[in-house]
A protein has these predicted regions:
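Bacterial N-terminal signal peptides
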Residues: 33-42
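Early extracytoplasmic/lumenal segment of secretory-pathway proteins
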Residues: 51-119
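Extracytoplasmic ligand-binding site segments that recognize negatively charged/polar headgroups
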Residues: 61-70, 107-245
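A ligand-binding cleft/hinge motif common to bilobed small-molecule-binding domains
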Residues: 117-122, 242, 247-265
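Periplasmic-binding protein-like
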Residues: 157, 218-223, 262-286
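A bilobed periplasmic-binding-protein/Venus flytrap-type ligand-binding module shared by bacterial periplasmic
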Residues: 160-167, 203-206, 278-291, 309
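Mature extracytoplasmic/periplasmic domains
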Residues: 285-345
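Conserved C-terminal helix/tail region of periplasmic/extracytoplasmic solute-binding proteins
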Residues: 340-370
């Protein structure tokens, strides 16, 4: 190539009656620089491709949830495999909608989501059917954490009654029925984004169940005067309880324990009918090119020590029954360490919930929130 350029430059000199030795030297230097850059890229590109290949992409909620997984299972996974974990964060439904648009070429390799929204992924063909033989630690899962052939529980919590005992003299909550007491008028808050908990409770108190939720409609309508507000997110829930504006809440247990840690004097109870069980789940995305790594990640998630650490950090229930939990954590209301404790809770079928959520939200907004 150098010789060809020199020849061309020589021809130029002949044609135009001048000499281009300096031009030849300059062009030779430029050519050598280009060749060096070319060979550098040739070496760097495979390394970059390898770097990209050695990443596992995990979709999860942001904030403390992302940090929870990063500091526990992702840390263990990277130490064992050398593979870096990259996170995509966002809201539950936003992430679902993005994966629908990317169907067949998923943005992530692994997704964490709620048990019922997981069914929306599965019904749309977005999750792989799990090969549990590749997740040996899953043998220790609680039965209630085995959500479907496509997604399984990562940890659990409850929605239950949390209240400010300092603002409610001599008030006790031993049953969900206590929310209907006349003295509760204008004191209760619940989530505006998911009424499934109180809908299921109302059906049970009416002698039915979530599948036949209509039988609890009159019961739930009778609770309407006792609602003061409906919170839109965790921060709003915290503000309503901390200020005392709503001294009673249908509250996420993990959120309540966070507030207690911030100095808000909340009492959390498990009614005699049981609290409403919630399970966050994990799944492998269909079309992922890192499925084998994804299975290793999920297996690391179910390591007994990792599950115990998650329980400690979030004050939630480990999904596996062999985790050794700090006794101070294990005794907290809403933290379950035995199969019997799991079974004592109100467990709304996740597939039913996925099918009914839109209908429930519409009915609740029209009949209770307006």
């Amino acid at each position: 190539m150098v010789q060809n350029i020199e020849a061309a430059c020589g021809e130029f000199a002949l044609r135009h009656g001048g000499c281009c030795e300096r031009g030849i030297r300059n062009m030779r230097r430029a050519l050598l620089a280009i060749l060096a850059l070319f060979f550098g890229l040739a070496i760097a590109l495979p390394a970059q491709a390898q770097d990209k290949q050695d990443k596992l992409v995990v979709s999860i909620w942001g904030g403390s949830w992302r940090d929870l997984v990063a500091e526990t299972v992702a840390k263990k996974f990277t130490a064992e495999t050398g593979v870096v974990v990259e996170f995509i964060t966002g809201g539950t439904i936003d992430r679902l909608n993005k994966e629908k648009l990317a169907k067949g070429n998923p943005e992530s390799d692994i997704t964490f989501t709620t048990s019922h929204v997981g069914w929306l992924y599965a019904n749309d063909g977005l999750f792989e059917t799990l090969d549990l033989a590749k997740i040996p630690n899953a043998k220790n899962l609680a039965d209630e954490a085995r959500i479907s052939p496509f997604h399984i529980g990562a940890w659990a919590y409850v929605y239950t009654i949390g209240y400010r005992a300092d603002l409610l003299a001599n008030m006790k909550f031993e049953s969900w029925n206590d929310l209907w007491k006349p003295e509760m008028k204008g004191k209760i808050a619940g989530p505006d984004f998911d009424p499934s908990h109180i809908i299921a409770v109302s059906a049970i108190l009416s002698g039915s169940d979530a599948a036949h939720w209509e039988k609890g409609q009159d019961k739930l309508k009778a609770l309407k005067p006792n609602f003061k507000a409906f919170y839109t997110n965790d921060a709003n829930s915290q503000q309503l309880l901390a200020s005392g504006e709503t001294p009673v809440q249908i509250v996420l247990s993990m959120n309540a324990y966070y507030m207690i840690g911030q100095g808000v004097p909340i009492t959390l109870v498990i009614p005699k009918e049981g609290a409403v069980l919630g399970v966050d789940t994990v799944a492998v995305m269909k079309g992922s090119k890192k499925a084998e790594l994804a299975y290793k990640f999920i297996n690391a998630l179910y390591d007994a020590d990792i599950q115990a650490e998650i329980a400690k950090l979030k004050k939630g229930s480990p999904a596996v029954l062999n985790a050794k939990i700090d006794p101070e954590i294990a005794k907290l209301p809403g933290v379950f360490t035995t199969a019997a404790q799991w079974k004592q809770q109100i467990n709304i079928d996740a597939k039913l919930r996925a099918e009914k959520t839109a209908e429930w939200r519409k009915w609740f907004a029209e009949n209770i929130m307006n």
